[in-house]
Swiss-Prot record:
Name recorded for this polypeptide: Transcription factor 7-like 1
Cited SUPFAM superfamilies: HMG-box
Portion annotated as DNA-binding: 346-414
Biased composition (Gly residues): 1-31
GO biological process terms, semicolon-separated: canonical Wnt signaling pathway; chromatin organization; regulation of DNA-templated transcription; regulation of transcription by RNA polymerase II; regulation of Wnt signaling pathway
Function noted in UniProt: Participates in the Wnt signaling pathway. Binds to DNA and acts as a repressor in the absence of CTNNB1, and as an activator in its presence. Necessary for the terminal differentiation of epidermal cells, the formation of keratohyalin granules and the development of the barrier function of the epidermis. Down-regulates NQO1, leading to increased mitomycin c resistance.
Cited InterPro entries: Catenin-bd_sf, CTNNB1-bd_N, HMG_box_dom, HMG_box_dom_sf, TCF/LEF
Region spans: CTNNB1-binding: 1-74
Comment field on protein domains: The putative Groucho interaction domain between the N-terminal CTNNB1 binding domain and the HMG-box is necessary for repression of the transactivation mediated by TCF7L1 and CTNNB1.
Species this protein is from: Homo sapiens (Human)
MF annotations from Gene Ontology: DNA binding; DNA-binding transcription factor activity; DNA-binding transcription factor activity, RNA polymerase II-specific; RNA polymerase II cis-regulatory region sequence-specific DNA binding; sequence-specific double-stranded DNA binding
Length: 588
């Protein structure tokens, strides 16, 4: 670290008695730092520590810590110093508060208990996470180990002798050997430390070339190398993945939470999408298997398989080999057809008549003026039949030789090859035609079903004369119903009913008026039978309601007889006379 000339006396003079000792220490040893480093501490701490009696001892301890830090930084290589000089130095206040507080953290940690900080006004400090429900029995606190969560970088590295100690912790391997005292710089984006990879440097285990390995890549402060640690800001080699301990100091805090507690997922990264930038994730997903990808920070479990939230899901998608088989199966019938077409078509050997036609066709064409092949074939057929047996035998012999030659040239050929192809073509044509017809029919049926409206039976409103339909059926079914209507109420009514019954059944009532008259006659017959048995009693004429439409017009036209008194012997002459006119009307 570059040192300035010690003029500490002037700085301590303005701050009071508490600052005199530290100013003298600064003036006595030049390696304690510049004046501007001590002024904020004296101004801020002096106000609170002046009334207390042990302020001088506390400041003495802080001076010792700072001197050890500065001495250790001076012991680094000359390249580290020169590199640190080239880098723009941040504001001195950003490092003063963590250094001052580090001594307060270190002293109670050595005595195995934690005291309240003497500077409660510092906002960016190490906070003991005593209220987090995820750390009481979680994987980071074996045996009730105390957990300290820090806010953000820059990291202040200390020697391994100043390791955070806790006597109750049985496994010190879970704690880091350096205490990262953190502060959130206001001039940087809050998500800057999470995006740790660049497009240019993806070499496992090697820091950027413009920084030496001895310098912290974030702050520029020289840091002591430790063999058991690897920088979490660079990808790890695949062999070193399983050797990383769980350092508590490297837990990446979540942005926006007041206590910076761990998420319920344990070591899950709070920003899995920001662990690697876009080019890095595409490179990892396309070129590396999941076992070759290093975790984004060493807080992950010590296994070769990274967290699924960090590995891009594109890695898990494997190309499906069965997708090629349908294409092959689709192409197979086409290729078979092409191969069949490529085969040369072997004609069958010529028979005797074909040989004769081949020989005589040119002569017939020369003799005849006809150009049609069908007419020429007919002429050749007539001439073939006109030949004698001897002449035909010559062509039969030629045909036999032709077959022998054909069998020698094509030993595996059979006539089924040619005819089978023709049949296949016919079948395919028929199938295609039937399928096209079926498709046309289905399309027409679908259109018809869409265009058709549901048929609803149209029923006209019933007329009042339709009401006694039940009485019509009962009248025609029972053979003795119209008998009393055609006969007198005397005893020989049975003979008249037998003679007159075919009349009433054969005369088909064509109009509804005639059926209405039949129903009136049936009711009058019932009234006559009841009146002969019981003259004084009320007739059962009104046992069935008589509709007005079914009554004959003569009955409705004579109100004195029927409506005046409802006795049967008064209504009987009118009802008996009406069916006689019905029989005479229906006869002609």
């Amino acid at each position: 670290m570059p040192q300035l000339g010690g003029g500490g006396g002037g700085g301590g003079g303005g701050s009071g008695g508490g600052g005199g000792s530290s100013a003298g220490a600064a003036g006595g040893g030049d390696d304690l730092g510049a004046n501007d480093e001590l002024i904020p501490f004296q101004d801020e701490g002096g106000e609170e520590q002046e009334p207390s009696s042990d302020s001088a001892s506390a400041q003495r301890d802080l001076d010792e810590v700072k001197s050890s830090l500065v001495n250790e930084s001076e012991n680094q290589s000359s390249s580290s110093d020169s590199e640190a000089e080239r880098r723009p130095q941040p504001v001195r206040d950003t490092f003063q508060k963590p250094r001052d507080y580090f001594a307060e953290v270190r002293r109670p940690q050595d005595s195995a208990f934690f005291k309240g900080p003497p500077y409660p006004g510092y906002p960016f400090l190490m906070i003991p996470d005593l209220s987090s429900p995820y750390l009481s029995n979680g994987p980071l606190s074996p045996g009730g180990a105390r957990t300290y969560l820090q806010m953000k970088w820059p990291l202040l590295d200390v020697p391994s002798s100043a390791t955070v100690k806790d006597t109750r912790s049985p496994s010190p391997a879970h704690l880091s050997n350096k205490v990262p005292v953190v502060q959130h710089p206001h001039h940087m984006h809050p998500l800057t430390p999470l995006i740790t990879y660049s497009n240019d440097h993806f070499s496992p285990g090697s820091p950027p070339t413009h920084l030496s390995p001895e310098i912290d890549p974030k702050t520029g402060i020289p840091r002591p190398p430790h063999p058991s640690e690897l920088s979490p800001y660079y990808p790890l080699s695949p062999g070193a993945v399983g050797q990383i301990p769980h350092p508590l100091g490297w837990l990446v805090p979540q942005q926006g939470q007041p206590m910076y507690s761990l998420p319920p997922g344990g070591f899950r990264h709070p920003y899995p999408a920001l662990a690697m930038n876009a080019s890095m994730s595409s490179l990892v997903s396309s070129r590396f298997s999941p076992h070759m990808v290093a975790p984004a920070h060493p807080g992950l479990p010590t296994s070769g398989i990274p967290h699924p939230a960090i590995v891009s899901p594109i890695v898990k998608q494997e190309p499906a080999p069965p997708s090629l088989s349908p294409a092959v199966s689709v192409k197979s019938p086409v290729t078979v057809k092409k191969e069949e077409e490529k085969k040369p078509h072997v004609k069958k050997p010529l028979n005797a008549f074909m040989l004769y036609m081949k020989e005589m066709r040119a002569k017939v064409v020369a003799e005849c003026t006809l150009k049609e092949s069908a007419a020429i074939n007919q002429i050749l057929g007539r001439k073939w039949h006109n030949l004698s047996r001897e002449e035909q035998a010559k062509y039969y012999e030629l045909a036999r030789k032709e077959r022998q030659l054909h069998s020698q040239l094509y030993p595996t050929w059979s006539a089924r090859d040619n005819y089978g192809k023709k049949k296949k073509r016919k079948r395919e044509k028929q199938l295609s035609q039937t399928q096209s017809q079926q498709q046309v029919q289905e399309a027409e049926g679908a259109l018809a079903s869409k265009s058709k409206k549901p048929c609803v039976q149209y029923l006209p409103p019933e007329k009042p004369c339709d009401s006694p339909a039940s009485s019509h059926g009962s009248m025609l079914d029972s053979p003795a119903t119209p008998s009393a209507a055609l006969a007198s109420p005397a005893a020989p009514a049975a003979t008249h009913s037998e003679q007159a019954q075919p009349l009433s059944l054969t005369t088909k009532p064509e109009t509804r008026a005639q059926l209405a008259l039949h129903s009136a006659a049936f009711l009058s017959a019932k009234a006559a039978a009841s009146s002969s048995g019981q003259m004084g009693s009320q007739p059962p004429l009104l046992s069935r309601p008589l509709p007005l439409g079914s009554m004959p017009t003569a009955l409705l036209a004579s109100p004195p007889s029927f409506p005046a008194t409802l006795h049967a012997h008064q209504a009987l002459p009118v009802l008996q006379a009406q069916p006689l006119s019905l029989v005479t009307k229906s006869a002609h």
